[in-house]
Amino acid sequence: MLFTSISFLYYFLPIVIILYFIVPKKFKNFILFLSSIFFYFCGEPIYTFLMIGEIFIAYVGARYLEKHRKKSILVSLLAIHIGALGLFKYSDFTINNINQIFGSKIPLLKLALPIGISFYTFQIISYVVDVYRGKVKAQKSFLKLATYVSLFPQLIAGPIVRYETIEKELDNRTSNFENFAYGVRRFVIGLGKKVLIANMLGELCDVFSTTNEKSILFYWIFAISYSLQIYFDFSAYSDMAIGLGRMFGFHFLENFNYPYISKSITEFWRRWHMSLSSWFRDYVYIPLGGNRKGTIILVRNIFIVWALTGIWHGANWTFVIWGLMFGIMLIIEKLFLTKHLEKMPSILQRIYVLFTVMISFIIFNANSIGEAWNNIIGLFGANGESLINASTVYYLKSYLVVLVIAIIGSTPLLKNIIEKLKIKTNANKIINLLEPIAMASILIIVTAYLVDNSYNPFLYFRF
C-alpha cells in the first residue's frame, strides 16, 4: 500500500484516524500498531513476521542488555539485525562477485528484499546501542517498542526516527487541532510534490532511458531532471511521513533542508537525508574516532562511513562508487578545499556543489558502471551525439514548465516570499484564507491523476 494510492488516501487513512481518535488514550498505541502491521502486511505478507521477530529480539535483548551492560550482548544483537539485513539485501550481490572473481558457480539465493528493512533495521540498531550507552532506558512495553519500530508513517522509507526522539511521545503525546491541521497540510504538500512534480520528472527521465534520439542537451536535461526528481520524490515522502506523524501527535525531525542551495558538499550532507547522515555520524563515524585521532584516521573513518552509506542504498557497485565519491569530496574539503571555497563567489560555490551532486546522481541512477560512464561522458559530447535535435526540443517544450517549477521549488524562494507576506496583517489574512483552498485543490488534482495512474512507487522504496 502506497501513500499515493486511492486505497490509502480514502480508505485506510480515514479509518485509522477515526479509530485513533475515538478510542481511549490507553488504546491509541494499540490502534497504531495494528494499523501499521496491516499496512505492512498489504505489501509484505510473509516478511511481516520477520519484522515482528526482529522487534521481539530487540525488545528482549535490550532489556537483558540494560541489566548486564556487556559488549558481547550488544555485539550479538547487532549481528542478528545486521545479519538479517545482509542476508536479504546483499547475499546475491556477494555470491555474484565471488562467482565472477573465482569462476565458481554458487547458486544465487534470489531472496526478495523486504520493503523498509534498511530503515527499520537502523532504527532498531540505534535503540539497542542507545540502551547500551545509557542514553535511553529499555522499553518495558513490547507494544510501545513495536509501535515505535513499525509506525506506518515512517516505516517504508524513513525518516530514520531515533527512539529518544519519540520516547516520551509513546507514553504521552498531544492530539489537538493545531497539530492535526499542520499534519494534514504537510502531508498534502508532500503528496503534491510527489505526484505533480516528481512523477512528471520521472516521465522525462524514462523518456531519456528509452529513446535512441539523444543529444548533448538531452544528457544535461536528464541529469538535471533526475537530480530534481530524486529530491522531490524523497523529500515528498519525508513531508508525508512527518505530516502523518504529526496527525497522531508525533514530532519527527526534519529530513531535508533545501540541499541544492548548499555551498559545499559538507553543507549538502547537512541538508540532505539528515536522519541518515546523522545516524552514520553517531553510530559509525564518532565510535571509530571521528576527527580526533589525526589525519590518517580521519581519512580512514570517512572512507568507511561513505562506503557503508553507499552500500546501504543498494547491492550494486554503482552505489559503492557513489558513496566513495562523496567520501573523497568530503576528505578533500576537510583537508584543504574549504578554505579556498570560502574565498569564491557564492554562485561559483553553488555551481561546484550542483555539478558534483548531479554527476553523483547519474552514477546513483545507473544500473551499471558502464551505463553511468556513458551518461557522464554524454554530457560533454563524447558519445558522438549532436548538440541538440528535434526530439530534445520537443521534450524540453513538453516538460519546461515542470522543470522551472521544480527548480524554483528546490529553493526557499517561495517560502521566504510567503513568510515576508505574513508579516503584513492583510496579506497574512489572505494567505490563511487561501491556504486551505490550495490544499483542497492539490488533493483534488492529485486524486484525478491517481485514478488513471494507480501505481507510482517512491524511488527510495528499493533501498
Where are these regions (language model features)?
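Membrane-embedded transmembrane alpha-helical bundles that form the catalytic cores
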Residues: 1-462
